[in-house]
Amino acid sequence: MPQTYSTSPIGKAAVDTLVRRAVRGATALCGGRVWRPTPYQVFGFLFFLVISLAYWAVPLCCDAGQHAAVVERLKANLLHPRHPMADLPGAGSPYYSPYAVSQGAFARLSGLGGWEVVRLAGPLNLLVLLTGIGRFVRVLTPRPWAPVLALGAMTLLWGTERAWWSGYLSLMSMTGNLGYPSACAIGLTFWAWALTGARARREGLVRYVGPSGLPGLAGYAGIGALYGLILLVHPITAVAAVLGAVAFVAGWQREWRSPVVLRWGVAAGTAALAAWSWPYFDVFALAADDSVDWMHRRLYEQLFGQFWLALLGLPALWLRWRNSRRDPLVLLFALDCLLVAFGWVSGHYTYGRILGLTLVPLQFALAVELAAPRPWGRARRALGGAAAAGACVGFLTVQGGAVVPRVLDPVGLEQPSLWPSYAWAARHVGKGEVVISDGHFAPRSIPGYGPNLAAPIWPDPALDERERERRLADVHAYLSPTSTRAERTAVARRYHAHWLLLTRWKRVPEEAVIVAWSPETGEVLARIG
């Protein structure tokens, strides 16, 4: 640094003193400010590693076979895929979303199968989710530890009974659900809420400002396109996303001049246009489809046991309501509860699918409150102690087995479901061939390898529900112990079935030839026709 000399009188003497004079920009010689990761970047990275390993360690189960089947059909024909589970046309199936089409394109380019693509999607969806959570919480508060606490609350504060469903992202359910479209849609929802909240509060960087002093229309159109994408990827998650948009705009938008209304109108119009222009299915027609309501009734059972730990966030949410009647998290929680209640009263139980996101206002309000700097008052200390105890209870009763291997488990934590693989059967059954199967696991898994089922187990708008029920009845009649050979032959010919995949409790028909069997489950693969 430059040096200057000054004279300081000490008594009668004058002494030359060396003084350093700071020069602007001198720190640039050392590279400027040293980058330091935020707490969320550190813990988020560790969480990403741990959950990705846990997800890869557990066999894919449940709906994964359905999503793998979707990838297989798109891999075979990207523009005109067949029905995900049957040898039928697939036009109108909502499974063929932009998310699935991108997976199908990747499968065609890489040569990977449906199961491998679904497996690879897990860490990518987790990345979208973690970045979305971080961005969303920063819109709620600048407190650096709030995103870390929000992630912990979202994954641990559920209940003491297992809640496992697509769209539920507790620590345990992440081991099976991360590869689903719902996980990606929830991550995109957090991003959409963050962008919506920032625009409503007029925060963040704005590249262009119009004559009215408001951000340009392009940003609002981009937000609308994001909501349209969520609607196509996972329509029921989009319902919760739209409720969040309403909550943040109603809570934080303070002026409603005509240019403001125009901009939010552009966002809504762009979302509708993006969804309407998708060629694979009509997403708006799903609003009148009640074929899956019956299977979602279970969502309303054991609600307290599955979700009561999230109620620890009620005091924090009440504080936000006391400070502002228009607080977005309060409005979002109220809107979600109203929709869930409507689903129960009306019999449209599919709306119960948003229960996982209904907990978010409770969990995130608690995280924001506990991220406040110290010293804490007595009430906040009590709330923090209760939240820590609740997290421990959730970890030890339900969630801990997701990340603690069985060999290292000292207390017998509940473990993720372990489904058998059907690669042994898929080696013999060609892609597109029709299989008649019974049991719980096989019909949900074998289509993911490429074969079709004579009777799809899940409803799909691409197949009339009466036709699906007729096929199920025919398969039931085929597998009946009292069926005759002529009756079985007629069913097999009707659906072009050439294979049987039967549990060890079923009798193999006399005309079938056993090709392979599983030592793990005792199931038998037999050739017919």
Predicted regions and their residues:
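Start-transfer (signal-anchor) and selected internal transmembrane alpha helices
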Residues: 1-52
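Extracytoplasmic
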Residues: 242, 399-529
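Transmembrane catalytic cores of multi-pass membrane glycosyltransferases
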Residues: 63, 219, 226-330, 334, ...
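Short hydrophobic alpha-helices at membrane interfaces in multi-pass membrane enzymes
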Residues: 198-228
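Hydrophobic/aromatic-rich transmembrane helices and adjacent perimembrane loops
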Residues: 240, 347-385
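Active-site lumenal/periplasmic loops and adjacent helix-entry segments of GT-C-fold
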Residues: 33-187, 210, 235, 407, ...
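Transmembrane alpha-helical segments
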Residues: 129-137, 176, 188-200, 243-250, ...
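Signature aromatic-anchored transmembrane alpha helix within multi-pass, membrane-resident enzymes
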Residues: 269-270, 374-400
